[in-house]
Amino acid sequence: MSIEVHAVSKSYGIQSALNEISFSAKKGEIIGFLGPNGAGKSTMMKILTGFILPSKGTVFVSGINVLKNPIEAKTHIGYLPEQNPLYEDMYVKEYLQFQASIFKVSKEVTTTVIKTVGLMPEVHKKIGQLSKGYQQRVGIAAAIIHNPDVLVLDEPTTGLDPNQIQEIRTLIKELGKEKTILFSTHIMQEVEAVCDRVIIMKKGELLIDKPINELKKSNEQIIEVTFDYKIEEQFIQRLPNMITFKNNFDNTWYITFDSTED
């Protein structure tokens, strides 16, 4: 597996950002990380890429323990954070050659990557002169400059116009033919357009992990219920058409029902 996440939790004091998250991904999969703001998507991505540590759990990328060998693991990871960290006063080619030098990549590879992401027409411009869509392409180019096995993209289409969104989606699908891609968004239509599989999160919990085609066929419905008082599991188990349930915290439950019958 390219990505293996085992029982990862992250807390900030008494606030839980992630609760026992586990999933895996194989080469060539594009996985959509779907959820509202505050679901824990960015936190999980920062842990996966070695930028923050989990409170507990383990993470492996290309068989390397990210927590024990973060520097080695990062050579296998390309990461585009939500806030694209670009040097706007640098020229496109200059910036990407600088990124390549960090990984000791040749100038020839830099040119190939520039062509791959469609930056040739803009290569002699300063990054600050580019549109948001082309700036995202620069960020993606920097993320793949060292030919990583895993590409982590945190909301890469946010703030783009419809044409730019379509262009970035097409680029991601092309890159996904050879790499494992984890792609976060809060728009379901985007997941359907780009991804093979979806992981749905809410309030630090993993609610669904399914292939897109299975999710479309599914008659399951998940609801979040907060009771006024403590409820025993036996009560939940007796609910009609109940498939699964999970106690999130206190008196709040996530309950999955078969919605074939009203």
PLM regions and their residue ranges:
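ABC transporter nucleotide-binding domains
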Residues: 2-3, 10-202, 206-208
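ABC transporter nucleotide-binding domain
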Residues: 167-258
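Short, charged/polar, Gly/Pro-enriched secondary-structure boundary elements
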Residues: 260-262
